[in-house]
């Protein structure tokens, strides 16, 4: 069943609380109350080419940003703006590849280095700059940062993962590192429906044939293959719900709900327009984001 809940072009979306769905429109982030017929409860300031948002459940701070790295910070649920326009010095950030603690945010910048934003004064600082390697992703697990790096040049290399502890002053303390030679590149990161498991879109050549969604298990220093990335399940479109063994396999034309172990198609949806992404909202509901609007689906 398809139900249109927004009529405007929408690129991304995610739940920030159990009842709140936030959506990326062309120039703003809009917040909707799912318990009240998707009533609008928040609308951000405008930024051209809005990209996405990052929400910290503990502090309830919402960082919205555009493709060129301009951003605003808000305090939820009031929606009060906490800053003037910020400049992150980074482009096309993935929200699940942003880390936050206290007054600081960490992310990879336009030079593929690690950058830290200080929200007290809006300043940024470049750290972990390396001539041979570049930072491609940052994964936060509690007070640890796992920093994914790969070779700057297109030569045979491997992903090196550096682990740092965030101390009480917001400084990074080196702990350990390891290399993953089968993985040539890890570009896409998205949290599972449980918001704890990290799913990485990995181009793989040695351990597994082809490209896969893999679950990152930092405590075991390993990656577990979940589902192949194919023309049907594009890297930037899908979403997993591992607890229920389901995945949204999405591409620009349709979305399928698939049982992961059996690869059985449980449902297929073909909304009007071009599909940009899809996300699980509950165990039996989801949302599809298209150039014609946002659709709620029930399966």
What annotation goes with each model-predicted range?
Residues 1-38:
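An edge-strand/N-cap motif at the start of beta-rich repeat modules
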Residues 2-9, 38-44, 80-90, 123-129, ...:
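A short beta-strand motif characteristic of beta-propeller blades
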Residues 8-18, 47-57, 90-101, 132-142, ...:
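Repeated scaffold domains used in trafficking and secretory/extracellular systems
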Residues 19-24, 60-65, 103-108, 144-150, ...:
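Short beta-strand elements that form the blades of beta-propeller/WD-repeat-like
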Residues 28-30, 69-74, 112-115, 154-163, ...:
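Structural motif
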Residues 34-37, 76-79, 118-122, 166-170, ...:
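Short loop/turn segments that connect beta-strands within beta-propeller blades
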Residues 106, 113-120, 125-182, 191-193, ...:
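Solenoidal tandem-repeat scaffolds enriched in leucines and small polar residues
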Residues 273-299:
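Blade-level signature of beta-propeller repeat domains, shared across WD40, Kelch, NHL, RCC1
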